[in-house]
């Protein structure tokens, strides 16, 4: 027995006793009856040069580099790799040929369905298609493509397609360069002519604009001269208007001052009269206040005394009412306390009664369970025992006797004796029953007659003692 530990890029594949299939672990105990294999899961680069042929039957070589390794993030894929590939070294010819066969097969099938132009121009899409198809095949071995790099396509010896394609591109580039040079020369000569024409045009344009500007300057000078003369005239008129306005304002101020002086004289006279009236009014008000204070002093003292008296009486009455209310409140509180105490006592009594009923019910339940067990759970026997023990039958008999005491009922008892005869013989049983029926009929009719007074039909016969009773009833009726 040994304890095995795998490195960071390794796993332990353990088989043997106690393991159903394969146990994958990084570290584990390995017993003598178990086998342990260490396999590496680090990816490996595989370089290939795949010879393929396009749909136009043009052969070429596809250099490719694939980085392939076990899928460590999928336990099922890792188990597949351990079962199928772990016994071979990842650099062995077996693994190399397996991967190369899958890549070459899928690449050739894909290239055979594409043209050379599609392969050459769609390198990115071509790489994705190869990646997906190869990965689909590698899934069954638990392998995954970490990276796939398709290099530049190469010609097969004897088939220089890419060489001719490069020469074609070079010739097209050279021809395009010549065309570009010719166009540049043409643009240069045309540009020189255009510059010369533009120079002449611009010179003529500048001369014309100079003449226009000189004429404009002369007109502007004349306009400025007229404008200055007009402004001088306007200034003179404004000054004359200002002088006239100042004269008018002076006359207005003189008239206003004269008016103000006359108004001031009138206001002074009126102010003296108003002051006299105000002083006279104050004198009269002071006289009225003096008389008012005198009257107030006379009547207010009397009213104050009456007010104090009324206030004292009201306070005394309020005090008496408060005391009465407090007494009534105290009495109500005592009554409420007494009522509460009585209610508590009644509640306690009811509570004790209820507890007694519960205890009695428990005792009766135990009693009934004991009785029921004694009669082997026979409810009818227990019911009969309880009715006999409690005197129910005696009470029923007394009640019935009291009920029919004053009714004076008629009770008929009869027996035809057919039971004993019915027990004898087998062949005569039917005849005995019929005979018993006939024997029973007369007593029944007699009983009906005694109880109800009704006679049987005439075809049956006449009852004994019926005629005397009828005659007796008739005599009573006549009497």
From Swiss-Prot:
Keyword list, A-Z: Cell membrane, Coiled coil, Lipoprotein, Membrane, Palmitate
- Give the record's membrane topology: Lipid-anchor
Major localisation? membrane
Any one GO CC term of the record: plant-type vacuole
Matching entries from Gene3D superfamilies are given as: Band 7 domain (3.30.479.30)
Covalent lipid sites (S-palmitoyl cysteine): 36
Q: What family does this belong to?
A: Belongs to the band 7/mec-2 family. Flotillin subfamily.
Q: What is this protein called?
A: Flotillin-like protein 3
Please tell me the species this chain comes from. Answer: Arabidopsis thaliana
Organism taxonomic ancestry? Eukaryota, Viridiplantae, Streptophyta, Embryophyta, Tracheophyta
Q: Which gene encodes it?
A: FLOT3
């Amino acid at each position: 027995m040994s304890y095995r530990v795998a490195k960071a890029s390794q796993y332990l594949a353990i088989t043997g006793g106690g393991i159903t299939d394969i146990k994958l672990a990084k570290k584990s105990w390995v017993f003598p009856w178990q086998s342990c294999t260490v396999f590496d899961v680090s990816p490996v680069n595989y370089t290939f040069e795949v010879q393929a042929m396009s749909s136009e039957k043009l052969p070429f070589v596809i250099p490719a580099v694939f980085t392939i390794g076990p899928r460590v993030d999928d336990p099922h894929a890792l188990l597949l790799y351990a079962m199928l590939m772990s016994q071979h070294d990842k650099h062995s010819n077996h693994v190399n040929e397996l991967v190369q066969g899958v890549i070459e097969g899928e690449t050739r099938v894909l290239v055979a369905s594409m043209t050379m132009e599609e392969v050459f121009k769609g390198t990115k899409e071509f790489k994705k298609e190869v990646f997906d198809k190869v990965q689909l095949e590698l899934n069954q071995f638990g392998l995954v493509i970490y990276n796939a790099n398709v290099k530049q396509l190469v010609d097969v010896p004897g088939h220089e397609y890419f060489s001719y394609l490069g020469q074609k591109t070079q010739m097209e580039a050279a021809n395009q360069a010549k065309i570009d040079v010719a166009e540049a020369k043409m643009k240069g000569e045309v540009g020189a002519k255009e510059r010369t024409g533009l120079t002449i045009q611009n010179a003529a344009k500048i001369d014309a604009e100079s003449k226009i500007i000189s004429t404009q300057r002369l007109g502007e000078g004349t306009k400025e001269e007229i404008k200055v003369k007009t402004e001088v005239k306007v200034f003179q008129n404004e000054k004359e208007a200002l002088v006239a306005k100042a004269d008018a304002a002076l006359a207005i101020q003189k008239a206003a001052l004269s008016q103000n002086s006359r108004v001031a004289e009138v206001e002074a006279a009126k102010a003296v009269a108003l002051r006299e009236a105000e002083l006279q009014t104050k004198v009269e008000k002071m006289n009225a206040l003096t008389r008012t204070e005198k009257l107030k002093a006379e009547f207010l003292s009397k009213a104050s005394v009456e007010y104090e008296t009324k206030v004292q009486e009201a306070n005394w009455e309020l005090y008496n009412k408060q005391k009465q209310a407090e007494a009534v409140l105290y009495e109500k509180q005592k009554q409420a306390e007494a009522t509460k105490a009585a209610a508590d006592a009644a509640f306690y009594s009811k509570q004790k009664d209820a507890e007694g009923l519960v205890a009695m019910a428990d005792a009766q339940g135990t009693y009934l369970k004991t009785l029921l067990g004694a009669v082997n759970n026979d409810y009818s026997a227990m019911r009969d025992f309880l009715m006999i023990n409690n005197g129910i039958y005696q009470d029923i008999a007394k009640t019935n006797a009291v009920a029919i005491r004053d009714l004076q009922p008629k009770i008929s008892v009869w027996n035809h004796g057919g039971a004993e005869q019915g027990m004898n013989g087998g062949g005569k049983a039917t005849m005995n029953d019929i005979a018993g029926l006939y024997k029973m009929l007369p007593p029944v009719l007699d009983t009906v007659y005694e109880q109800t007074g009704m006679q049987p039909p005439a075809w049956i016969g006449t009852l004994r003692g019926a005629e005397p009773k009828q005659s007796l009833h008739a005599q009573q009726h006549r009497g």
